[in-house]
Swiss-Prot record:
Broad enzyme group: lyase
Quaternary assembly: Homodimer.
Binding sites annotated in the UniProt record for Mg(2+) 2: E39, H154
Record site: Essential for catalytic activity: H137, E175
HAMAP family: RibB
Full protein name: 3,4-dihydroxy-2-butanone 4-phosphate synthase
GO CC annotation: cytosol
Transmembrane segments: none
Binding site for Mg(2+) 1: E39
Length: 215
């Protein structure tokens, strides 16, 4: 990736990661790019702990519509969320679990407010499996232990960013799409970020930062 295109968001990996962490601390979303040889996509990511209905609506409006809740393996076990399929043969081994809906406080589960309620239910400290119905309209993703140092995915990046910002290890993500329904690539992601005032970083930035600081 031509790093100069990311210079408006920081001239180094460290700057971009610190800007993203600061944005997370203030409850603002960030855009995370993966490698051009991987998915070559940009995800808009919010801390699960602070996401609002307005932010969820933006994910739904500008994203693919598949809004995912990225959580740790420990949280998946706490909620008794099994994998979506027994044998995961997807190219990038994206670890979807069964989909979920809050058992209380939602109507159809589709609206932005309902999805936020489901997310807040799932990440509550005292959450138990019966707090959730299955299936639903929120797609949990199980993050690999070790985060981006183990798997260079948006799932792990969101959990790592939440942890580095001092939040629960949970993030809400959705891939950004163009108006014609195609996937937004780096140039479109940069323009989207400038339009809405988001920070941008790459997963490799996060890897470099974690290795440099041994965190």
């Amino acid at each position: 990736m031509n790093q100069s295109i990311l210079s408006p968001f920081g001239n180094t990996a460290e700057e971009r990661v610190l800007n993203a962490i600061n944005a997370f601390k203030h409850g603002t979303g960030v855009l995370v790019l993966d490698d051009e040889d991987r998915e070559n996509e940009g995800d808009l990511i919010f801390p699960a702990e602070t996401i609002t209905s307005e932010q969820m609506a933006k994910l739904i409006r500008y994203g693919s519509g598949i809004v995912c809740l990225c959580i740790t393996d420990e949280r998946c076990q706490q909620l008794d969320l099994p994998p979506m399929v027994e044998h995961n043969n997807s190219v990038n081994k994206t670890a979807f679990t069964v989909t979920i809906e809050a058992a209380k406080g939602v109507s159809t589960g589709v609206s932005a407010a309902d999805r936020v309620t489901t997310i807040q239910t799932a990440i509550a400290d005292n959450a138990v499996p019966t707090d959730l119905h299955r299936p639903g309209h929120v797609f949990p993703l199980r993050a690999a232990n070790g985060g981006v140092l183990t798997r260079r995915g948006h799932t792990e990046a969101s959990v790592d960013l939440a942890r580095l910002a001092g939040f629960k290890e949970a993030g809400v993500i959705c891939e950004i799409t163009n108006d014609d329904g195609t996937m937004a690539r780096t140039p479109e992601i940069v323009e989207f970020a400038k339009k809405f005032g988001y920070s941008v970083l790459t997963i490799e930035d996060l890897v470099e930062y974690r290795l440099a600081h041994n965190i």
